[in-house]
Amino acid sequence: MTIEEKLKLLPEKPGVYIMKDKSGKIIYVGKAVVLKNRVRQYFQNKEKQLPKVKVMLSHVEDFEYIVTDTELEALMLECNLIKKYKPKYNVLLKDDKNYPYIKVTVNEEYPRIMFTRRIEPDGAKYFGPYSSAFAVRETIKLVRKMFPIRTCNKNIEKDMGKVRECLYYHIGLCSAPCTNKINKEDYIKLVDQAVLFLDGKRDWLIQKLKEDMKKAAEELRFEEAARIRDQIFAIERTSEKQKVVSVGEDEQDIISMARSADISCIQVFFVRDGKLSGREHYYMKNTEGMERGEIISSFIKQFYEGAPYIPKEIITDVELDESELLSEWLSQKRGNKVFITIPVRGKKKELVDMVYQNALEALKNDISIREEISKDQVVLELSNLVGLDYAKRIEAYDISNTRGQDNVGSMVVFVDGKPKKSQYRKFNIKYVEGQDDYESMREVIERRFLHAIEEKELIEKGELEEDKAKFAEMPDLIFVDGGIGHVNAVLQVLSGLGISIPVYGMVKDSKHRTRGLVSPQGEIDIPMTTKAFRLIAQIQEEAHRFAITFHKEKQSKRFKSELLNIPGIGKKRAKALYDAFKSIEEIKRASVEDLKKVEGMNEKAAQAVYEYFRK
């Protein structure tokens, strides 16, 4: 049966539709209030669809549907199918199967606390999900310091009295129920306290502990009272770090989102008893072209589908298309009413704005980390091209002059693929007459590495601090803006100084664009589409920019200095003439009338300049 024939048979009932590709793989799952209307929209208005939907439809070879009695049932089925199949074109909670939880096995006689990535219907209590394994392990460590409950899988009843206390008992992270150091009743009380702490009910827990401490003191159990007192202090210290974000004893999850071109970051603040008890951020993929409300709705469905706990209220900052339906679904899972709130003013609005700012920061940090990793990969790619393991520090050199005048050299530095401008260096060419790029390059390289040798000697003698040195750090790779002649000039200097560093010329094509690298072994053609090519082009452009900027600065100084020798020409007129003509040669060719047109010039000053260059 063709898709067109199937479309005619769609019922006017709620349900779930399943898109499949030519291999029968599920690539998209959606729900509909009316299957007939929703599914037909895809195939009857293809040109009006989002680009991502158009791509998806180009792969659809078949579809199926499942009829449900209500839209709520359709939502529940949609959540289950997305979780099971993780279809390619659905908005997905990134790597949700890997998010870790804290598990407390309250279903066991002597409960344990542990790290897990699976929620099972085993009667245990689960807390999370957390965004990282590190966060889970640090939280478990903190809980065990205050409530020393076990993590091992010993059979306590069977091993009682047969084993010795482990290391965790001696460092205060376990109360050793296996050796009867604590009776069962007191151990269960510890576990209950740990659960209250993880639930965010810390004020209630402190009140309960104070009652226990008072009772222990009245019964002259002073050691026990002191232990409880220390517990209270530890809990209060952690509570001090929690920001009071709400009045009363509210249970809220506050959700907001920030996005880049290819990923969306969802930030969740968990408020328990009116205090911020934790926060986590998660990533959603396949969100290009989607509205914020759609993305947050998808997150809510996937996040709470397997969550061990659902709060009374979810606060977010955007209208959700399925707000009422989601509220009904969450209420069913929780067992009583769950409210979804979109505040426009007041305390709740301030809270959701704060969560948005945190989502934005988390996204910026993620982008920064991804850029760092990307840069490392680019440097590795470039290093492999030139036979190095990793060119951490790359130095690039260029020469700039105007027909031999105002001759300068420049050195730019890239560390881990990024420019390090604090280590750029400028060189006035002192010993080369006229325009000779090879000799100029020899001079720059010789001076740079002689400085390095001198500074290293001073550092070894203790006469120079390493962080004060300007040239001591040596490059792993040298680039020069030029061809094989420039490369050979640099290699000759380095050889004479006993230094061995790979040198490559950054050659250009007939249109003065970066083409590749050249060395005595030949030219390396690098495809323009590679990241290594783009890094080389960036280095070449930066070396050229830095050299020509310095050259123009020097030229400008000389130009203005020469003009100041002319009667009636001060700094202001000299600058105006430089801005207008850009070179001494152009001023020499200018007529009196041309000179008079420059801002601040008059007949007398123009005549003086004209005559000065015709003596």
UniProtKB/Swiss-Prot annotation:
Residue intervals of the UVR domain: 203-238
Gene Ontology biological process terms from the UniProt entry: nucleotide-excision repair; SOS response
Principal place of residence: cytoplasm
Domain GIY-YIG: from-to ranges: 12-91
UniProt cross-references to Pfam families, sorted A to Z: GIY-YIG (PF01541), HHH_5 (PF14520), UVR (PF02151), UvrC_RNaseH (PF22920), UvrC_RNaseH_dom (PF08459)
Disulfide pairings: none
Any single Gene Ontology cellular-component annotation: cytoplasm
Subcellular location(s) per record: Cytoplasm
One annotated GO molecular function: excinuclease ABC activity
Coiled coil stretches, renumbered: none
Keyword Aminoacyl-tRNA synthetase: no
Classification via SUPFAM superfamilies: C-terminal UvrC-binding domain of UvrB (SSF46600), GIY-YIG endonuclease (SSF82771), RuvA domain 2-like (SSF47781)
Keyword Glycosyltransferase: no
Subunit description: Interacts with UvrB in an incision complex.
Protein's name according to its UniProt entry: UvrABC system protein C
